[in-house]
Every structure is written in structure tokens, then in C-alpha cells.
Amino acid sequence: MNKYPIDDIKAPAYLFIGGEVLFMKENIKVQKVSTRLDVPTSHNIKAGDILTDQAITIKGSPVAFSNSNVLFDALAFVKGQRLPKIDNCYIVARVASGKWVKWSFAPAIHDTIGSITFGANLPMGEHGWTVYPNPLKPNEPLVKVEETTAPVVSNLEDAGKFMLRVLGKYGDELAFDTDGANIDISISTEDAQNDRLIKYGKTLSDITVSAKFKPRNISLDDWELLTGITSAEEIGTFTGVNTCEDLVLQGAKKGDFMFTLKSARCKDPSDTFSPKDALMDELTFDAMGDNFGDNKLVIGTVAEDFQFADESAQ
């Protein structure tokens, strides 16, 4: 490959995960991270160090994708499950006119799912993948580099679908509008290590899902019912993980994305009595999941155009 002044290289790139293509906002960040243990002599002088673990992280905020499943696959995993390694992960980048390079990674683990924001210019937060060495083949590189040709990119779906009008439903009775919403997703993991303490993967500890929004086009009575702020609750009462209503946030048109927070409960609701501010503050709902505390967020598509009950009656 020809040499170029490193400062002059600008490298627009595509990320392929499991063969599916992702186009990231602004950049794709690849970082090699290592942990080393100092080895001192008897005089407490550092003689060197030992490499104890190493990994490569890949991070970026998707703006377009060929298949949304590659972004939300981890939502279906259950606690205690080993996060699967995904083959066929690589970056194809243009480093000069007509010059493309391909970085092929060892199998990667999807361990970070970014937030989903409706009604903003940044619809999706940062996703992350981690590449670990294979303990059975410790000499294999984590990434291989080669020259290649321009990638063949299929039709991409714009993440702007998440920027559409967001409607909400809670249970079977309550339907309301919003002025935008945000869904935060956090994955907690534990390192998987062999008997020589070499990290080779991750085990899922838990997934937490919460949604924030301000309801609109809702009556005061329905808002009080939605938040539970005026409901009487007895101290010491047990509430099972799958006993609350489901919260649905969805687009208004058929085919739009629909996000279902399983057994969602309003967390610390508040209101503001003021001559200047709206009574209805932003609400936060936490998903508790199914009977085992799993499957907290289910993603689908809207089957038909949404209509409020009073609209359909007109």
C-alpha cells in the first residue's frame, strides 16, 4: 500500500457486524485496551510487566443500518447467559481516492446498547462491541488488515424512523401523546475467565430499561392514573416483577417502530403547581420484565395507523 501523511488521512467507513452493515454518525472508534502487571525485583525495582488481559473495543452511534436486529439482539438474552460471539465483523474504510482497507476482527461481543431518542437529531446512542482473544489460540491477532475494494452496501434503513411522532399506551385503557421520548438501555456483565484468569468473554448479569417522556393530550384523571401519584400504597406490600401494565411507545403510522416495556412502573412521579410551568413533569418508567425479570424491552412494528378513541368516533 502507498504511504500517505497520516494527518491527511480521513477515513469514512462502514462497520459490518455479522455481515449486516452499519453506518455511524461521524466516526467509528476502535481501541486496543490492555492490562499489565508490574514485576519487581527483590529491590522493588520494576523489572518489567506481564500482559494479563487484552481486548479491542469498537464503538459508534448508528444513523443507518441494513437490519435493526443487529443493534438489539442482546435484548432477548436472559440473565446468566454467555453473550455470544459474532463472526464476520469488519470495517471497510476509504483512506485515499480509490484506496480501501479492511480491518477484520476476531469474533465480537455486543455488550453496549445505546439509548433511543425520539424527536432529536441524535436518534440512537453509542453501541459497543468487544473483541477478546481466543484462549485456545493465544497467538492469533485480534485484527487483520488488508487492502480491499469498495464495499457493496445494501439498502440501509434510516435511524430517523425513531424521530417520528411518539404515542404512548399504558395497559388497555390509557392512550396519550408525547412531545418526544427517550429509552435508556444498560447491560451489566461479568467477565468470563478460564483457570489461568484469561478473559475470553462476558456473562450477562442484567439488562435495565427505562423510558422518559412528558405525556400530552391526556386528561388530568388519566394522568393521575398513569403516574399513580394519588394512589394509596401500603408500606410493606409486595409487588411481583410481572404484575404491572406494559408501557408501549410507538410511531403513529403503520410500519413504524413499536417499543414495549414489559411490566413498567412509574418511578418517583412529580408534578409542578406553578403559574408558569406545566403541571405534568417528565415521567420515568422502569421495566421489570417477565416472570423471570427478563425480556424487559420488546421491539416490533405498528400493525395499523394509531387513532385515539375520540378521534375514531368522529
Where are these regions (language model features)?
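Residues on the solvent-exposed faces and adjacent turns
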Residues: 32, 95, 133, 185-187, ...
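Short, acidic/charged, Gly/Pro-enriched secondary-structure junctions
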Residues: 72-102, 229-257
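Charged, amphipathic alpha-helical segments
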Residues: 1, 61-82, 138-150, 216-237
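Short, loop-centered acidic/histidine patches that primarily coordinate divalent metals
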Residues: 106, 132, 252, 262-264, ...
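Protruding loop/beta-arch "assembly-hinge" segments enriched in small, turn-prone residues
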Residues: 130-154, 279-314
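Short, tandemly repeated low-complexity microdomains enriched for cysteine and small residues
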Residues: 28, 71-76, 102-108, 140-147, ...
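Solvent-exposed edge beta-strands and adjacent loop segments
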Residues: 1-70, 101-126, 152-223, 263-281
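Short Gly/Pro-enriched loop/turn and capping motifs at secondary-structure junctions
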Residues: 98, 254-256, 266-268, 290-292
